[in-house]
Amino acid sequence: MLTDRQLLILRAIVDDYIKTAQPVGSRTLSKRSDVTFSSATIRNEMADLEEMGLIEKPHTSAGRIPSELGYRFYVDHLIRPESISPQEAKALKSLFAHSVNENDRLIRHTADLLSELTHYTTLVLGPKEEGQRLHHLELIPLAEGRVVIVLVTETGHVEHKTLQLAEALSREAASRLMERLNQTLRGTPLRQLRLRLLEEIRRFRSEHSEQTTLLSKALDIVLTDQHEERPLIYLGGKANMFDQPEFQDVAKLRPVLELIEQQEALFDFLSPSLDNQILITIGSENNVDALKDCSVIRAHYSVDGVSLGTLALIGPKRMDYNRGINSIIHLLQAFQTELRKNSLD
């Protein structure tokens, strides 16, 4: 159990190190207005904190820096909630002032804004479409037998593909087919949609001859492609990595960049859980070797209780946890509101 004095000194060390990236000594701490005891007392308390494994001494400095255990204690017990600045609140309001009814664009905007607010790299795992439901299908005939097929989910995600049919399809025929299909299939989970859709088209086939047969094949292709896609990972602020003193060492930065570029290894790491609370993992807690020098703040987003994806910040272990957590909390609320609007449109 730490004393009040030790708690104050540990918080001061972490706060100073986050701001300066320089080891913190007793002389530096003694100049702080909230530290009112002598340098000798500070040194004794720092020695105790080091013995507890909460701070450590870098090889090249007389000062101390937080250990992973120290950061964990700080995150769990010492963070003080802060509001975002008026300028940041204005930026959030501006981003969502005009409704963005395509989730892809909305997610990209969100990733970019979160990286601007925090100056860290942002990853957003997009919705896993197989867990969603159909809102409606659209069939738009074009010239020379071409047709655009559009699939819209209840969360506003849009998939579309242009296909070539052997015969031109009239707008009247397309409208009748889509009206019937949407009446029957609205709300169907995407993982069940392909079979349900083909069953409906078979029932409808006698009314539309060859065109419906071709259309069933086209829809089958669209839904098969869509169903097999993995969720997209949206990236914001990749260049922010280069601004961190820790990552001036290319050997530390390279594996992080390679992990982000590959993306495949990130799916399990970012996949939503049933717990919608913010999750903070520090260094070795990430269980991904490339992130051993990083901290990650994750929050899962949802619409009407359905978990859809993940917002994540990646930075050094020395990241500003207060700023990261508060930025995610405020952005998450606005982001989920826009997703919910899209699901109702």
UniProtKB/Swiss-Prot annotation:
Pfam families per UniProt: HrcA (PF01628)
BP GO terms, sorted: negative regulation of DNA-templated transcription
Matches recorded under InterPro entries: GAF-like_dom_sf (IPR029016), HrcA (IPR002571), HrcA_C (IPR021153), WH-like_DNA-bd_sf (IPR036388), WH_DNA-bd_sf (IPR036390), WHTH_transcript_rep_HrcA_IDD (IPR023120)
GO molecular function: DNA binding
SUPFAM superfamilies: GAF domain-like, Winged helix' DNA-binding domain
Keyword annotations from UniProtKB, A to Z: Repressor, Stress response, Transcription, Transcription regulation
Function: Negative regulator of class I heat shock genes (grpE-dnaK-dnaJ and groELS operons). Prevents heat-shock induction of these operons.
Similarity comment text for this entry: Belongs to the HrcA family.
This protein's name: Heat-inducible transcription repressor HrcA
Gene this chain is encoded by: hrcA
